[in-house]
From Swiss-Prot:
This is Subtilisin-like protease 2. Transmembrane segments: none annotated. GO terms for cellular component: extracellular region. Pfam families: Inhibitor_I9, Peptidase_S8. One of its GO terms (molecular function) is serine-type endopeptidase activity. Belongs to the peptidase S8 family.
Length: 422
């Protein structure tokens, strides 16, 4: 293997103070609930025949209640079972039901839980003037990185994510962007009547941090577009469909040890999706998630609260926590998340500089892809242990009660000749 050094010229017209993206909600209020739509989780251990019989029962109850109470006249969605999700040992379905049917479902002996569907939000970002300090930070062992007109080396192994797939559950990816060099793949589009493109920009931006030739941590990795958002929000009906597709695609393609999922999304605590991420972990699949941008404890957010996801908070170039970044004991690691330049919407060469934990999470997802390309990491537990073992401790100012560990790619410990004075 060879070792590579990428010189990054950091140009910024001015230094802004702490950025403050609009916060995502911590709890599901009335505006977050999707009226008449539910996510039903079944108990583990049911046979295929039991699940089939249960769904027949659901359909009969739903039809009877529609006939008895004319639920469809209320304008609430009551179309019955909509989509089915199977992630490892977890069986779920979404559906449009009247309240009486939902109550009957909750009492069924095969049902673990019935939750109203909710809106979920992209971990929001703030646009600022262009900068590229984040990559240099990845190989600097947490050494503060100058922001103004300064050359910073990003040092990395030339395997650089080769032969690894990063799945981006987001707004889609412009796979034709020059940064992806043909490594972008259109995977799944859950949004009905919308093309599999990225008109919002967020997914392309995230993918560029993972695997862009200029802006990416893992410059040779493949990025797979899994579109569950069309704008800044979506629902678990689409998100679970997309996450289910990702897990099946990774499993069917026999690439569990060569794949990572990035979720730069955030919403109120939602146990059904935390359960989905946990079951993907049990199935052998690594998921990296944003801590969220509320400036509060990430334990109240999903998917940040998923116990076996890698939860990522944002750090600034001088090792301070931006005021927007969530924190707490659930945060595993800190990564660059302010003034990060990457790909953008609008053209195949467009770029944008943004801030938020949406930028921090793909730095770590990129690191996972990078390490998978040349290390034997046989399980998500091994991946997490390796990523955390490489971190540099006790550098983040105002980390509150979070584990104080900043991201590092381990290059200085590898047997290479480093540049003088690095």
């Amino acid at each position: 293997m060879q070792f590579l050094s990428l010189n990054l010229l950091l140009l910024l017209p001015f230094v802004a103070g702490d950025l403050a993206p609009q916060p995502e909600p911590l709890r599901a209020g009335p505006s977050d609930v999707v009226p008449g739509q539910y996510i039903v989780t079944l108990k583990e251990g049911l046979s295929s025949a039991q699940i089939r019989d249960h769904k027949k029962w659901v359909n009969s109850v739903h039809r009877a209640n529609l006939d008895s109470f004319a639920a469809g006249a209320s304008g609430v969605e009551t179309e019955g079972i909509m989509k089915h999700f199977h992630i490892h040992n977890l069986n779920m379905y979404s559906g449009g039901f009247d309240e009486k049917t939902a109550e009957e479902l909750s009492r069924n002996p095969y049902v673990k839980s019935v939750h109203p569907d909710q809106h979920v939000y992209l971990a929001k970002t703030v646009t600022q003037p262009q900068a590229r300090w984040g990559l240099g930070y990845m190989s600097s062992k947490g050494k503060p990185v100058p922001l103004h007109s300064t050359l910073v080396d990003y040092l990395y192994d030339d395997k650089a994510g080769e032969g690894v797939w990063a799945y981006v559950l987001d707004t889609g990816i412009n796979v034709n962007h020059v940064e992806f060099e043909g490594r972008g793949i259109l995977g799944h589009n859950a949004i009905p009547n919308k093309p599999h493109t990225d008109e919002f920009g967020h997914g392309t931006y995230v993918a560029g941090i993972i695997a862009g030739k200029t802006y990416g941590v893992a410059k040779k990795a493949n990025v797979v577009s899994a579109k569950a958002f069309d704008t800044g929000s979506s629902t678990y009906n689409y998100i679970l469909e997309t996450y289910d597709w990702i897990v099946r695609n990774i499993t069917d393609s026999n690439r569990k040890n060569k794949a990572v999922i990035n979720l730069s999304i955030s919403g109120a605590k939602y146990q059904p999706f935390d359960d989905a991420v946990e079951n993907a972990f049990k199935a052998g699949i690594t998921t990296v998630v944003a801590a969220g941008n509320d400036g509060k404890d990430a334990k109240n957010n999903t998917p940040a609260s998923s116990p076996n996801a890698i939860t990522v908070g944002a750090v600034r170039w001088e090792n301070t926590r931006p005021s927007f970044s969530n924190y707490g004991k659930i945060v595993d690691i800190w990564a660059p998340g302010e003034l990060i330049k990457s790909c953008w919407k609008g053209s195949n060469t467009a770029t944008s500089t943004q801030s938020g934990t949406s930028a921090a999470s793909p730095h770590v997802a990129g690191l996972v892809a990078y390490l998978m390309s040349f290390e034997n990491l046989p399980s998500p537990s091994a991946v997490t242990a390796r990523v955390l073992n490489l971190t540099i401790p006790n550098l983040v100012k105002d980390a509150k009660d979070s584990p104080n560990r900043v991201v590092y790619n381990g290059i200085q410990e590898r047997k290479f000749t480093l540049p003088k004075d690095y």
